[in-house]
Amino acid sequence: MEAVERVNLLGLDGAALSELVGQWGGKPFRARQLQRWVHQRGADSFDAMTDLARDFRAQLARDCVIEALPVNTEQRSSDGTRKWLFDVGQGNAIETVFIPEDDRGTLCISSQAGCVVNCRFCSTGHQGFNRNLRASEIIGQLWWAKRVLEAAADTARLPGGKAGEDTRVISNVVMMGMGEPLLNYDQVLPALRLMLDDNAYGLSRRRVTVSTSGVVPMMDRLSQDCPVALAVSLHAPNDALRDELVPLNKKYPLNALLAACERYLAHAPRDFITFEYCMLDGINDTDQHARELIQLARQVRCKLNLIPFNPFPASGLKRSPSARVRVFAQRLMDAGIVTTVRKTRGDDIDAACGQLAGEVRDRTRITERNATRTIPIQQVHA
């Protein structure tokens, strides 16, 4: 007789969990109790759920699991940034990075192992695409990090404990790790709903950000299903250049993308879209590009986030000099465009989208020795 795969409760949003419990004759409040045990208390054992009936716990133990991805490595930077490398099988791995700041703690999570969008400046795309992550694997990154960080914070508060950033816990989540979230929509959506659910993580929509390269139809769906804060990987002020840097632009050009952004704003928790713009020396950082970008930005309520590029050999690209970035940013601000320059965090542990995952692929796939480095995950202003 073939064994039935047990349900991983990490991947079930409130509606799905209520349906499962209802199939066993349970009431909706039992599902809410169970959800709080899993996501708020971080329980990984049904025996620990002492306010649930013994028979119910036995049913859960037979049919369900609470299981995050295995952790290959964990690293910590001198600035407090922490990075986990999760094993997704077949020699592939994804990264999750926690960035503590004075006023927030931001967790950057992945939605795919690899990426199909293949932006020219991103090493993750050069590595290719392995598979979509399941909802349990997406939310499992948050579940794991929350447990680790809260345990560290509890320890730091003890007499003689270490104060400071050790007490910072997760207040914001950004989907800016590996992958294009909107190309894994059916798994990303329940993960987002769990992040917002008061019986799970209870984050406000303003504190959860999805970053997309511009999958227009799915932007429209997200605006209806779960309108969290939105960041768009722009990186070019015109179609000709964006076609080269972000190949998806050939399918969804800027006029369609900007129209989708405007539609999204009707439902968004913030009154602006964040445009991400990776600064590439001599490619998209000239005064003319700044003028074009100003005209584009005036079409949509937005803010610009300029990102210094971290070169990798396969890209053939260079980082814009710091002086050029400052001049570029000043031109935008002088035109009334809210502009920030992302600050690098976690340099000493290579806290980078896909970077260490690429190294894992190198070690396990001899034919992919040309997989190289990537753009660091840096300070995120969600």
Curated annotation (Swiss-Prot):
One of its GO terms (cellular component) is cytoplasm. Reaction proceeds by a ping-pong mechanism involving intermediate methylation of a conserved cysteine residue. Residues 101-348 form the Radical SAM core domain. [4Fe-4S] cluster binds at residues 115, 119, 122. This is Dual-specificity RNA methyltransferase RlmN. Its main location: cytoplasm. It is found in: Cytoplasm. One of its GO terms (biological process) is tRNA methylation. The gene is rlmN. The keyword ATP-binding does not apply. It comes from Bordetella pertussis (strain Tohama I / ATCC BAA-589 / NCTC 13251). InterPro entries: Aldolase_TIM, Methyltransferase_A, RlmN_N, RNA_MTrfase_RlmN, rRNA_lsu_MTrfase_RlmN/Cfr, rSAM. Its cofactor is [4Fe-4S] cluster. SUPFAM superfamilies: Radical SAM enzymes. Specifically methylates position 2 of adenine 2503 in 23S rRNA and position 2 of adenine 37 in tRNAs. m2A2503 modification seems to play a crucial role in the proofreading step occurring at the peptidyl transferase center and thus would serve to optimize ribosomal fidelity. The active site is at residues 95, 353. It holds the Pfam family Radical_SAM. It catalyses: adenosine(2503) in 23S rRNA + 2 reduced [2Fe-2S]-[ferredoxin] + 2 S-adenosyl-L-methionine = 2-methyladenosine(2503) in 23S rRNA + 5'-deoxyadenosine + L-methionine + 2 oxidized [2Fe-2S]-[ferredoxin] + S-adenosyl-L-homocysteine; adenosine(37) in tRNA + 2 reduced [2Fe-2S]-[ferredoxin] + 2 S-adenosyl-L-methionine = 2-methyladenosine(37) in tRNA + 5'-deoxyadenosine + L-methionine + 2 oxidized [2Fe-2S]-[ferredoxin] + S-adenosyl-L-homocysteine.
